Each structure stands twice: as structure tokens, then as C-alpha cells.
Amino acid sequence: MIFQSFLLGNLVSLCMKIINSVVVVGLYYGFLTTFSIGPSYLFLLRALVMEEGTEKKVSATTGFITGQLMMFISIYYAPLHLALGRPHTITVLALPYLLFHFFWNNHKHFFDYGSTTRNSMRNLSIQCVFLNNLIFQLFNHFILPSSMLARLVNIYLFRCNSKILFVTSGFVGWLIGHILFMKWLGLVLVWIRQNHSIRSNKYIRSNKYLVLELRNSMARIFSILLFITCVYYLGRIPSPILTKKLKEASKTEERVESEEERDVEIETASEMKGTKQEQEGSTEEDPYPSPSLFSEERWDPDKIDETEEIRVNGKDKIKDKFHSHLTETGYNNINTSNSPIYDYEDSYLNNNNTGNTEIFKLQLLDKKNENKDLFWFQQPLVSLLFDYNRWNRPFRYIKNNRFEQAIRTEMSQYFFNTCKSDGKQRISFTYPPSLSTFWKMIKRRIPLLSLQKTLPNELDNQWISTNKEKSNNLNKEFLNRLEVLDKESFSLDILETRTRLCNDDTKKEYVPKMYDPLLNGPYRGTIKKKFSPSIINNTSLENLKERVRINRIHTIFLPNTDYQELEQKVDTVAKKPLSTEIDEFLTLINEFGNEPKSSLNLKDLSLFSDQEQGRVNSEKRTKFVKFVFNAIAPNGTTSEKKSIGIKEISKKIPRWSHKLITELEQQSGDYQEGVPLDHQIRSRKAKRVVIFTANNQNNDPDTKDTDTADQDQTKEVALIRYSQQPDFRRGIIKGSMRAQRRKTVIWKLFQANVHSPLFLDRITPPFLFSFDISGLIKPIFRNWSGKEGEFKILESREEQTKREEKKEKDKKGENKRKEKARIEIAEAWDTIPFAQIIRGYMLITQSILRKYIVLPSLIIAKNLGRMLVLQLPEWSEDLQEWNREMHIKCTYNGVQLSETEFPKNWLKDGIQIKILFPFCLKPWHISKLYSSRGELMKKKKQKDDFCFLTVWGMEAELPFGSPRKRPSFFEPIFKELEKKIGKFKKKYFITLKVFKGKIKLFRRISKETKKWLIKSSLFIKKMKKELSKVNPIVLFRLKEIDESNETKKEKDSLMSNQIINESFSQIESGNWPNSSLIESKMKDLTDRTSTIKNQIERITKEKKKVTPEIDISPNKTNNIKKFESPKKIFQILKRRNTRLIWKFHYFLKLFIQRLYIDLFLSIINIPRINTQLFLESTNKLIDKYISNNEINQEKINNQKKIHFISTIKKSLYNISKKNSHIFFDLSYLSQAYVFYKLSQPQVINLSKLRSVLQYNRTSFFLKTKIKDYFRTLGIFHSELKHKKLQSYRINQWKNWLRRHYQYDLSQIRWSRLMPQKWRNRVNQGCMAQNRNLNKWNSYEKDQLIHYKKENDSELYSLANQKDNFQKCYRYDLLAYKSINYEKKNDSFISRLPFQVNKNLEISSNSNTSKHNLFDMLGNLHINNYLRKGNILYIERNLDRKYFDWKIIHFSLRQKEDIEAWVKIDTNSNPNTKIGINNYQIIDKIDKKGFFYLTIHQNPENNQKNSKKAFFDWMGMNEKILNRPILNLEFWFFPEFVPLYNVYKIKPWIIPSKLLLLNLNTNENVSQNKNINKNQKQNFFLRSNKKIKNRIQEAKEPASQGEKERGSDIENKGNLGPVLSKHQNALKKDYAESDTKKGKKKKQYKSNTEAELDLFLKRYLLFQLRWNDALNQRMIENIKVYCLLLRLINPSKIAISSIQRREMSLDIMLIQKNLTLTELMKKGILIIEPIRLSVKNNGQFIMYQTIGISLVHKSKHQTNQRYPEQRYVDKKNFDEFILQPQTQRINTDKNHFDLLVPENILWSRRRRELRIRSLFNSLNWNGIDRNSVFCNENNVKNWSQFLDERKPLYKEKNELIKLKFFLWPNYRLEDLACMNRYWFDTNNGSRFSILRIHMYPQLKIN
């Protein structure tokens, strides 16, 4: 057995070794490459298919294999790879070759094609076949399925150690695959040739010569296929001649580009080197696998040459390299033998000869412009033909405001090299290429022996020791901090703060976060900082001058320098010789640009400001450059001696040298300076429609010509109209190839829209594939339930609404179809060339024809006609109407201009002609007597008061609409005639009728008498016969019986028929879905019954006529018994039976019908009725169950409101048992209740709920029905697990709630939420007076002990750190809870840190009282755990006193109200009573700051006296009402804008109390003054550097600002001066700031406009929100206004358009200063503040979900009632104390529960501590890296931080497993650290999958 298992084990391991061996993998990957089929196979197939002898086949195969072998070798051998993989060589060689080959195939006599001689080697065609196959194999193109397969070998080569072995085995694998393929192909061909069925095919036999033809034309077929592939690839190759060359951004930038190339030269060259496989690797990233004939490399082509040279031929080539590069950029005029260029390398290495290079650079620059045009032909051919800067690939042009040009994305970001990492030599894939090149150069210079080689162990040990030292230091520091904590000497200094880069020591200003390297790491941009001249004061100017001058010169010399480099190079240029010229230099700059650039603005690379740069022509520039150089030239000797300085090695980001603009930007003129005037990016087809031009004369003599041109432009009001056709351009750049674009596949012959194949499934499938199953099933069910009687009543209403909806839908659909048709027509006119011109002229001719020819002639004809018919002519009326008709020229969109004015470019853009009051010819005009009826008609036709003229002279409702019907001229005439004829006919017909009737009667009488005579004669004959046979008495008796029975039967049948008809008519009356079917059935039935009736009637009539004299009543039938005999009875029965049998069929049918109706339907309806009743009853039960006596009014209210998470209904009755026990199982009660409540309102706002309710834990529901109901509503998903219900504690639940700040809306969002009446009703409920409220003053003082008397330093640092800490803590807790949620009852963290206010509450007694099966909840208020500010918006609980904010109405219009509103600082009168509700105002509001007013829980709230609100769910007695941030009246103080801005930028630094400082204008002015003295700086100043638009106040010194503030405060609430001051500031501000670059500054006419602009620009998001109808009306109004503005006398049209309701005055209220409040009240304008996390600040990412970033220190007070729970003693983190149930909790010591001890450290240091201590370096040698996660022995213990001796838990001594989320504390860098590479990725996409618990479990003994 052992032996067997041993053998088996060996076998397995052997197999694994074989499978993993290089050879096997190589074979596998090689085999896979066979499947990448390219055009090279075409030649091979050709040789096989065309029977040209074996020699050709052999040569083809060998050529094919040789080509592939070369490709494989090229992977490993670099020179060959460079030769084959170079784009230009292949393109240049391939195209001519392909074309040559194609033509050669078509000319048979070119060589002796086809005929083989004996000496076959001399025959050229065989060599050609070989060459074809060889060369085609080298072209790296493919057809099926993807080039990826061909590249697999290259990719896998990275992982292999023995590369040659892998390459050879790969080739062998390919060979095997190829041989198999060839064999299979041969078999197929043989089978085709030999297959009898193919040969005996009828079609082939009938066309005998078809096969021969095919065989003969095989060569042609192949050449056609080849040509197609060639053309296909030609489309994808950047052809050197045809593509459009983009203009460089500007001449300076060209210069820069060349400089940059020179600077980056070495680096990019070496970048190409990498490892040999690197080029192939880069193709992986290529969005198009192999887009051209060869694998087009994605970098600078010339640099590939250089790499080659460096790699292969070493040092000698370098000098040529530099030279060749210079020639390329146009420096080839220098005589190389004499120039110092050969010293360049030496100077680079040895720092000598720098001066020469320096001067040499200058010379080059100077001469470059002259020589550029002269020597262009001397540039290398490659770079002339294939400019790598050309935008050949259809990349998107992604603009970047921070950088000058767009970054080139196609550069590989990987460069592989070995480096020291973790004490070992490892391969790094982001190694700086310049370093490796530099190292190689050093190696060549210095002999290898002198370079010390460090042993690997040395490295390792050194690294380990330094690491140990660092980790020890960290641990020490950490422990020290913890010890300080233990000693109870708590101060915030224990918490480590983040180091920030300081900008200005005096003002304590930090660098903005975006630019702070200590926060964000090295940032890829440089700061663009612009100082306006007024801000820079004298001292700073002095400091700047020297630096700026030198830097400016530097920007000319070394264009692409960085700020850091500059610091090192300040001394390189001699300062003295420059000083004389420099002032002229600066003045010159100032002439060109208004603003001097700051020292940081080096990347601008221009000597001129943004506005002017485009305008300064090249002559000025060259003069200027010469001036600068001449100024320096005499002193050149001094600069020679200086060293060039050490260059910092950094990777230059490759950029495009173009700045491109879109078509749209070109039209609107929004582009910046230095950009070509012509657009390069093709925008969507659009037309600029000018709707209004104001021709204001420019009277200002000072303005220059350029300005006037600008002004004229701005006077045009234009709309941009996009054509409705699909956008095939999609921002493509001119000259790039459309064929290569991704995601724009066109697969149809005519395709309306561009589709990405990704969304194929979304496209509506063709008709064949769509099966409407439900549509098929419905009618079947309808038929089945077709005969229901009662059900119809239930469904009728629903059906009716459905039908109505369907009608509406159809109508909408019809409108949409019409709209679509109109658009299509419009687009057709737009797209066809010259169509607009033709259409325009046609319209104008039609207009003239209509107005002046057709209509007048019609009027004349009509009136002449009237005269002929002897009626009065109506000349005046007709002419009046004709005059009223107006033809107005409109733009193509239908914007009205005027009668005379044509739209701009109307021939090109198109025109519409709108006819107002179109003339309609009427046969007569209605007199005034009939006007009342006419008015109604008019009202109906008011809409038809205008129309658009079509090309054929018809009238259309809308442009390009279908022509409408005109009321016919003859129709009323005909109607009148018809009426008269009708009257005449009536009289005539009446007489005719009477006459006819009489004739009929006469004829009938004659007929009847005739019949009667015949019948009576026959009857008499019969009677005679009968009488002779039978006794006469019997005869009469029998007749009697017979007659009576028959009549009875007839009556019966009549009755039943009637009933049936009635019942069916009832059924018919209902709204049946399948009525047509039922109708048809019923018709059949009624037809049958009626026929029976008729028959019966006819029989009876006949009988009556025959025997009129015998009239025997049926009553006498009883006498028959006397005369009965069996024989007679039998006869009667027989007769009856025959009749019954005859009618049985109908009876049976009727019976079944009745049975169905009575029985079957009732059976069907029983369950329906039952379920309905059941549901209703359950609803009622639940209603009763949950709220026994609810106010009905509340229900009504609930339906009106949009509800928040739970609308907890208030109940106003007392419960006898007051002392409730709060400790109970929440899962049973609260959520069920919440869900029930959610089902109540008509409108459910689910968007916020879903996230809360969807969690896969215990199901909330006692009844599955409720659950199903919510599932259908879509509130949660169905996978709720039915686990064991968990027990929650109230405080845990509250703590959970407290952390979900989504639901805790900031107070600004709420203003007057509900109608006042309703609020009053709630507030007027009985309110128990609370005695304890008087203790508030003392309490406030206690609470504010830690607020540390408001002085600046404390205020900022304390608030900042504390809030930050709380934020962190909350993240931790969230993380902890979400991981350890199973052990809720054991969780030992349940409180927030920093319980500043000692706001204690008494634990409730544990006497429990049950009510209605539900545990009662204590009266705990949510205000203690919601943000304090939000108390304003909670509906008041009835037994508390609050300050009711809603009483004070706040309106912008009444400034006095603002004053009163602010005056609520009640130091003067602490017990002010406001309003009827006697709310007591809380004092010291100013201390807290207006935004965070706290309302405290009652300290000694006696629960026995407080009224229990029934079902106070989780203590949430106050209802929270959800509203969006709509009524933001605060922000409409101009006062608040800068403040808000400051707060936005530094939310941690400025406590919000500062925001209202200026508005606290109350009696205690002195106190406020004191506060202000403490805060010496004007906070406007503080915000200045952050706010882009500088507020004018900042320009004044701080002292002046303070004086102003003092005076403001003394105004005692009169905010006028404050506001006006600010408005002045705004005015100044807007006069200074330029709103658009390169444009004239914008002047504001009014303050409102300026304010509006300020709001809408930066601080607020605004939306114009209206419904479609309003939108439509708005547009209509605008169109009318456009017309009215042009008319000289607009009143007439205005009035008529108002009458026609074209123009609605309510919408377009023209006011001089439109008040925003009005718009907001109407709900049209919605303004919301931009959230604090708007832009690029990673720290605020979580803000959207949890608003911790806004938390102020006064906001959180923890609810400290923890019944029956043990409490953490702060002294010892791990000790629990059992509290007596009624004892007050001791929270006097201000400690906090540390969830994670390391939170003391800052995040970066925390990370370091973790990584150093947890990933123990010593254990890495023998262990797999990931074992850290599972091997607990490796994990350092945390017992040093947590006291081991004491048990952590109450009864259990469990392990605490502290797991950490990846997100909250430690960002993604940790993950990158794990792998010991800092990933160089542009975005975090690679990380998105890693949702892991990163840190190992923390083990505590």
C-alpha cells in the first residue's frame, strides 16, 4: 500500500512538473497561436488549391514556416524585433509590395506566370511564392479571431526564466498546430474533389463548364480577396500624405516641444529599451489589437532608432544620436566638427563645459526660426512622413485645465528594472527609465571593478535593522501616548495631528489641500497662482522682484523647468549684469500683459499674459527674444563659469503638442489664447441661430477697434440648434481615422445611429424575434371568463381607466410619430445640398403668390359670384381680413423675427414663414345677431390663428408638419342647400306616406279576404268529411284541450325568451373586455328566439283566422276529465313529444347558459369576494391593533405629507401604567411598526429607505403578507433570511441611528415645512409645564466647560481635532458593527467619545408593564442623538418646552424681520415667552452659534409625571419631515456668501458660530465686541486665498476691517449698511475680475445681477425645474418676445397674442430686479448649496452617505441610559462595571472609549505602524507572502496595548476580533504596500475588485 501511494504521489508530482514545465507551456501557447488566422493563409491556400505542382506547394509552405520562425525569433532577438516591429519600415515596404503583387497577379505576361519549366529554381515564380508567404507572415495583421492569440507567447515570456527554451517550444507548438491544420485542409480538398454527391449535383452537371471556370479564375478570386484585405488595412494605416496635420499650438510651444524632446531624449530612448519584450507587452494595452499592418508601437518612432543604437553599438552611437536629433529639430546648420555638441555627453556626466552648452542653446534658439523653413527637407524621411505628433488614432481629446496640453496616453507606463526593495533585489515595473540609462552611461565610463557589489545578505540585514529601528521608535511613541492617556492627564495633544504645509507663517495659512504634498503625495500639476496687482503689497513685491526676474529668464532658457529644480538653479545665472536690463524687461512684459505672472507659473512657458498671447505676432516676439538675448550676451563669460546644477530625475509626462478646440467653441468664441483659430475637433452638427441683435451705436471714443468688434458680438442673442440626426462625429479629431474608432460599429447598409456592440441586447429586436406571449394569452383567458355576471361590476371602473389611459397613450404616441416625421423632413432639408436655398426661394414665392395674387383673385371671384346670385357683395369684410393676414419671417426653428427682416444666413440655414391670422374665404359673413353662437366657434378655433407656410403653399400647424385641412368654401353653401331640400322633401314625403298607407291597407284587405275565402272553403270541405265520421260533441271538446295547451306553451316560451334576453342584455351592458365575442353569441341567441317567436305568432294567427268562432277559455279545461279516454291522452302526448323534441335543442342550450350564469360564476366569485373581505378585515384589525384611538385628522394629514423613515403617529391618551420597561426585543416591534406605517401613506418616498431596509438579517415580519406587500413595492429584496430574532437594546439601536446622518438633515433644509394651521393644532395639545427648565443657565455653564472661553487658538484646534476624532471614531464603530453584527448583545462599544456635556439621564426602573402585547418604550427624545441644529424641524413632543422657530417668519423683503430673527440671543431676557405655545427660549444661543442650537434633554426628567406617548418608536416622538434643500433663505444674504465660502474651504477650521457673527446685532453689543477682539483677523481675509473671486474687503488691512465690523455691530440690527458695504465690494470685485479669459470684462447693471452671478457661479447649484407644459409655454413666449422686440408698434400683436394665449403674462413677468424668492416660491428656480465634497477631495468621499464631515462639536450628546448593561470604565479600557439600575452614571471624567488604540496616531503613521509590526520582515524568507493573513503565529500580539490581566467581557472570556475595513481608516495605499509596489495606475480601476478585510485578526489573550 505504502509503495503504491508513494508511486502515485510521485506520478502526480511528475505530472505537475511536466505540466508546469517551460516546454509544455511553450507548446501549448505556440499551438494556440495557430488559431490566429491572417491573410498570410491566403497565399498558402492558393498554393494548395490551385494545382500548380508540388514545387510551388513546398516553397509556399517553407516560406510560411520561415516567416513564422522569424516572428518567433524576433520576440527574443532585439535587432530583428526593431526591424520588424518598426512602424514606418513595414508601412513603407508593405504597401508598395502589396500593390505590386496585386498588379502582377492581374498581368499574366509579367513573368512567365503559370507555365513551369524544367529548371524550376530559375523560374522566378517559385521564389515569388516563397517570398510572398514569408513577407506576408511578417506583416502582423490578422482576420480571425484576434491578434491576442498571436501575442500570447510574447506575454507569457515575461514569466519564463529559460526564454530561449520557451520560444523554441512555442515555435514547435505552432508547427504542430500548423501541420494539423494543413492536413485537415488537404483532406477537405480531397474530399471535395472525390465526393460523388457534389459531382452528381444537378446544378453542377447542368453547368458543365462551371467547375472549369472556377478553377481557371481561382487566381483572380484570390487576388480579389487579397486586394480587399489590403484596402481594409490601408484604411487603418496612418497614411503619411492624406491625413491632415494639426497646427501646433503656437510657435513658442513648438520651440518648447523641441526643447522638451531634447530634455527627455535619454529618458524616452531608454524607455523603449525596458526588457526585450516590452514593446510586445505594450501592445496588450492597445485598444485595437494590431491596428495597422504591423504591431504599431505606441511611442516616438525616431526614438526606437536611438534605442537600437544605444543598445547594440554602445557609446559611439550616442554622439550621432544627439546630432541626428538636433538635425531633426532643425539645428543642422551647425558645423558639427567645430561645435561643442560632442562635449554634451561629457558635460552631462562631468559637469564641465556647461557654459558652452548654455550659450549653444541660446544660439540654437536664436537661429531656429530662420532655419526651420530652409532645411525642412533635411529632416529624416521617417519623421517627415510619419509625424508621431499627428493625431492619427481617433483618441478622444481630453481637456485638462490644469495643464497646457493634453497628456499622451499611448506612452507605456511600465519600465522594468531591478531595484532594492525590502532588502532584496526585485524587479520593479515602474522604474524611472532615465535612471537606468544614466546608470548604463556611468557603467560605460567607470570600470566595472570600481563599482562595489553589495552582497544580497548585506542588503537584507541592513534593511531589517533599519526597519526594526523604525518600528521600535514608532512603538515607543505609541506606547508613550497611551501611557499619558492612562495617567488621566488627557489633552488633545495626545492625538497626533496631520502635518500641513504652511503658506504664510504670519497668517497661519495652509497651502490648499489640492497642492499640499504632505496630504496628497506628489501632485502632478504646478500651482497656477495669479496675484492681482492690488493685492501684492510693497514688501512682498520687493521679495518677489529678484526671484521673478531670474525665473523669467530661466523660463526662456530652460522652458520646461519645475519649481523644485528652479530652487536649485537660482544661482546659475549671474545676477549683476542682468539688473540693469531687467527693469526694461519687466516693463516690456507689463506692456504685453496686465498681470505679471508669479514665480510659480513656469509651466505657462510664455512671456505674455493669457489675453495678449494670441495677439502678439511672431515679429514682436522674435524682437523681444533678441532683446533679451542681446541684454545677456555681453556678459556671457560669467554664466559660463557656473555649473548647470544637478537635475532632479523625474519622469516627464508626454503631451500632445496641440491645443485643440471644438467647432462649438470656435463659434461661441469661448476658447483661450494661444489656440489656433480654426477648430480641429468636430462637434455635433449644429447651427447658431441668432434670435436677437441689438444695434446699439458705440459712442465711447476711447474703445479700440478690437473692443467694438467684441461688443458687436456680444449684442447678438443666439441659440445653438443641434440637428436631430445621430452624431457620427462624436468629437473626432480632424485627420484621425474613423475606421479605428472603438464602440462605433456600423453593420447595416443604412444605419440611423451609432451603436456600440456592448448594448446590442438593448436594441429593440426585429419583428420576427419579438413574441408577445402575454398578448396571446390574454384573449384566451378573456374567452374563458367571458360570461361572468357579477365580476364585471368590480372590473368596470378599472377597465374604464385603462381604456382612458390607453387613449392618452395612443394620442401621445401619435404626437410623437408626427414629431418624428417632422424632424425627419427637417433633417432631410438640412442634409441635401442646396435644398435650403431652393426651399427658401420657394417659400418666398409662395408667400408673395398667396398674399398678392391668389387671395385677392379669390375675393374678387367670390364677390362677383354673390352679385350674380343677386346677393350683396362683401368687399369691405373680405379686404379687412385679407389685410389682417401677416407673413412673418422666422428662423429655421420657428423663432419669429418680423415681416421685413430676414434671418441671418437664411439661404444657408433655412427659413420659415409664419402666417398670423391666415385669411380664410367664407361664402358669407355671420351677422352680429348670431355672434353669441359664433363666439363659441371662435373660441374653439383660437388655436388656428396662425400657421406655417409649406413649400406647396399649404398651411401647416407646425414647421414641416402635415398640411392641415382648410374649411371649405362650398361646404356651408351645400349645407344650406341640403337644409332647404330637406325641408321640401319632408313636406312631400308626409303626403306621400299617407297616400301609400291607404293603398297598402286596401291591398292588404283584398289579399286577406281572398285568403280567407279560400281557407274557409277548404275548411268547410274538411268539416263535412269529419262530421260524417265522428260525433260532433267530441270534436269540439278535443279542440278545446288542444288549443288551451298550445296557448300555455306559447306563453311559457315567450316568457323564457324574455328572461334570457333580459339577462343577456344585462351582461352586455357591463364593460366587458371581450364584448365582441359575447355580442356575437347573444345575437345568435336573440335571432333564434325571435325566429321561434315569429313562427309561433304566425301559427296562432292562422289558427285564429281559421277558427274565429270557437273561443274557449283555458279555465274550462278541467271539464275534460269527464270525456277523457286513454286513446285520446296518448294522442295528445304524442303531439307534445314531437314538439318538445323539435325545440329540445334550444331548451338545452338555454338551460346550460342559465346553469353557468347562476352556478359557475358564483363559484368563481366566492374566493375573490372572500379574499377581498379578508384583506379588508385584516387591514381593519391591524389598524385597531396598532393604534386604538387615533385621531382621524392625523390620517388625513399623513396622506398629504411625504413621509420620512417612519411617520410615528401621535396618540393623545394616557396610559394607566406609567413605569415602562425599555429593555425589550426591538425586532418584534419597531421595524414591523415602521413597515406598517410605511404602508399607510399614499406617496411613499422609497429612495432613502431602500438602503436602510435591505439587509440580509432577521426578517422583520410577523406576517408573510406584509412582507410580500413590501416586496411588491420594491422596498427590499426577497432574500430576507428567517434567522433567529436578535435582541437589540434601545441605545444600540439609537447609536446605530445616530450614525446614519443621511436622515439627519441639516437645519438649512427645513424651513416652513408644514402649513401653520396644522402646526398650531399639534402645538395646542395639552402641554405639561416642566418644572426643571429653570435650571438651564447653570446647566449651560457646565456643558460649556470644555468650550474654553472663546479664544482663537483653542477654538480652532480643539474643534478641529475633536471633530476629526469623532469622525474617525464613527467610521471605526460602523466598521466594527457591520463586521461583528452577529454579537450585538456582546458589543462593548456603545458610546461616542467626548461626552462633553454631562447631560445625564436617570435609568428607568425595571418594572415592566405590557400593553397590547407590545413592550412600552420610554419617552426618550431623538433630539439627543440627532444633530442639535435639527431640533427646529422636529414636530414638537407635547410634554416638552421648545423654542419654536417656525413662529418667526423669515422673508428677504422685510429686513426688520431679519433683525428680530437675529435678536434671539436672549442674554438680556433668558425666559422670553414667544407665541401662544409658551416656548421657553434657550439662552446663550450665541455661544453655540446659530447653526448648532442645542436643545438638551431634561437633566432630571421625572418619567412618572411625563405622559407616555403610546408607541413612541425608539423614542422618536418628534416627527421628522423630509424635504429637499429648497428654501435656503440664508444664502440670499450677500453677507453670507463669503462666509459660506470660507466654511466650504476650511470646514474644520472655522466653527460655524463665526458665520453669524455680523448678524448678532443685539443689545449686548459690548459682549460681541469682546468676542471680536479675540478674533483679531477679519475672516474675510482668511478666506481670501481660497476664493477665486477676491472680495474687495480683503484688500483693506485687518484693523480697518475690525473697525468696520465694530461699526456694523453698533448699527444694532440695521443690516442695511452691512449689506450695502458688501454690495459695494461686489461691485468693485466684478469690475476687476475678468469673467472669461481673453474677453472683455463684464460690467453689471444692478446689484442683483452681480449677486446672481456670484451665486450661480460658484457656491450654489441651481436648477430651473418646470414641467413640460410650462417649458413649452416658456419657449412660445420667448418666440413671441423676439417678434415684439423687432416691431415698431408691438401693442397690436402683443394684445392679440395674449388673446390667443400664445403669450402668458404670468410666466414672463418682466421686473427690473427679479426677486429670487418669487421664483423659488413658484418652484421654478431651485437653488441648493454645493455640497462640501464637491471637488477632488478624497477625504469627503463618504460624505454623501454619512455627513460626518459637517459635524460640529456641540452636535453630539450621547444618550446615556443603558438599562441593565455594564459600562466601560474609562480608566481601564478593558474593565466593565455593573451599574445599579437606578444609579446615576458617572461621566464626570472626560475620557473616551477607544475602539482602536492606534487612533491616537495619524492615519499615515498608523499605517506605518501596522505594516511594520504586522508584516514581520524576518518571517518573509521561507513563507509565502499571504501566510500573514492566516498564520496567527506571525501576527504580533496587541496585548501590549490592552491589559492582559483583566477579563474583557462580563461572563465570557472571549477573544475580541477586531477586523478592519479597507476603507475607513486606511486607504488603498496599504493594499499597494502589500504587494510592495506602489502601483503606477492612472485610476483606481485595478483596485475596485479588492473588497477584502485587509488586516489580520487581532488576538487578545
Swiss-Prot record:
Q: Where is the composition biased (Basic and acidic residues)?
A: 1591-1611
What membrane topology does this protein have? Multi-pass membrane protein
- Top-rank taxon: Eukaryota
Cited InterPro entries? TIC214
What range does the record give for the signal peptide? none
Question: Has keyword 4Fe-4S?
Answer: no
Q: Which Pfam families match?
A: Ycf1
Q: Which GO terms describe its cellular component?
A: chloroplast inner membrane
Question: What is the role of this chain?
Answer: Involved in protein precursor import into chloroplasts. May be part of an intermediate translocation complex acting as a protein-conducting channel at the inner envelope.
Q: Would you identify the family this protein belongs to, as annotated?
A: Belongs to the TIC214 family.
SUBUNIT field:
Part of the Tic complex.
Q: What is this protein called?
A: Protein TIC 214
Q: Which organism is it from?
A: Nicotiana sylvestris (Wood tobacco)
Give the lineage.
Eukaryota, Viridiplantae, Streptophyta, Embryophyta, Tracheophyta
